[in-house]
Amino acid sequence: MGGKIDMEHNEGINKGQITLYALSTCVWCKKTKSLLEDLGVAYDYVYVDNLFGDARDKALEEIKRWNPRCSFPSLVIDNSRCIVGFDEKKIREAIG
């Protein structure tokens, strides 16, 4: 796959590598994004439904590594853990 995923970056406190894969129309994705902003952490995110071609394929391939059902939101933390769906308690515990 030659496509590159162009992530958006949200500035904040560095709590490790945090990547949010979301859909622009997803309420739970918006809640997850809002929680990350409330926590004041730096994170990267992408709205997968706004991607096309190789970039979309690459994003879906990456999500499936962590979440075979490819559901949203998928929040990957430090390339070692994935929280699927909006789970405020798990997100707060994982980010500290």
Annotate each predicted stretch with a short phrase.
Residues I18-L20, V46, N50, D78:
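Short, contiguous strand/loop micro-motifs
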Residues V48-R69:
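Thioredoxin-like thiol-disulfide oxidoreductase module
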Residues G3-D44:
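Local sequence-structure signature of Cys/Sec-based thiol-disulfide redox active-site neighborhoods
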Residues K64-R81:
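Short, basic, helix/turn surface patches
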Residues K30-K33, R56-D57, E88:
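Conserved strand-to-helix beginnings and helix N-cap segments that scaffold or border functional pockets
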Residues C26-C29, G53, V84-G85:
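Loop/helix-junction capping segments adjacent to catalytic residues or to phosphate/diphosphate-binding pockets
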Residues I77-G96:
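Non-catalytic, surface beta->alpha helical segment in thiol-disulfide oxidoreductase systems
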